[in-house]
Amino acid sequence: AGPSPDRYLWGNAAFALAACITAAFAKYGWTAAIRGYEGGGAVENLNVYKYRQTNGETVALCPTEVSITDRREKELSDLGFIALIYRKNSDKAAFFSGQTVHKPPVYTSDTANANARISARLPYLLNASRFAHYVKANMRDKVGSFMTADNVSKYLNNWISQYVLLSDDAGDDIKARYPLREARVDVSEDPGNPGAYKCVIFLRPHFQLEELTASIRLVAELPPPAV
């Protein structure tokens, strides 16, 4: 039997996730790169306590209070929980899930369902919130000017275009700095409020790998590749 977990001071994994978010922001200026060992979600240099069992074998105590399997992590993610997953025989762990507690509504349209699922994922939600905050803060400085709806639309579209990367083949670091694949800002006048405008921002991020379903087939002759 190993040492009792009650003898150690455990910390909330939320602080580790917050550290990943702040590290991504400090490096890229955005907070999408917070998942996976290679995607910014790694937690390194964990304290690994090693002890000797009665049979003489040296065993490392898991630095996370609970060792969560991949299957259990997927179940927790589907319920809106982000788990810290320990990599065995190392001093590292990582966050793989980006799901929030918001349950996406189900629609009859595949496009609407896809948009709802994206809106429930933390990396995209953090970036979208930052864009919304900047638009409100920036346009507040324009209050009192003589900008028309077209002027505001051109101004915001020119601004947001600097964060759009059209290439799907760019590296992860480049996509982290330019988090949008497409973007558009629509500005219209508020008929009942002269001088007031309504703004709708459409954001299409660079999608992150969520899961991969693999199948294995044993054949005597390789078939032609699927088109």
Regions found by a protein language model. Give the residues of each.
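Generic structural hydrophobic/aromatic packing signal, biased to beta-strands
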Residues: 84, 93-95, 135, 183-187, ...
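C-terminal edge-of-domain segments
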Residues: 184-227
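Glycine-centered secondary-structure boundary/capping sites
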Residues: 78-82, 168, 195
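Long, charged, glycine-rich C-terminal linkers/tails
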Residues: 167-190
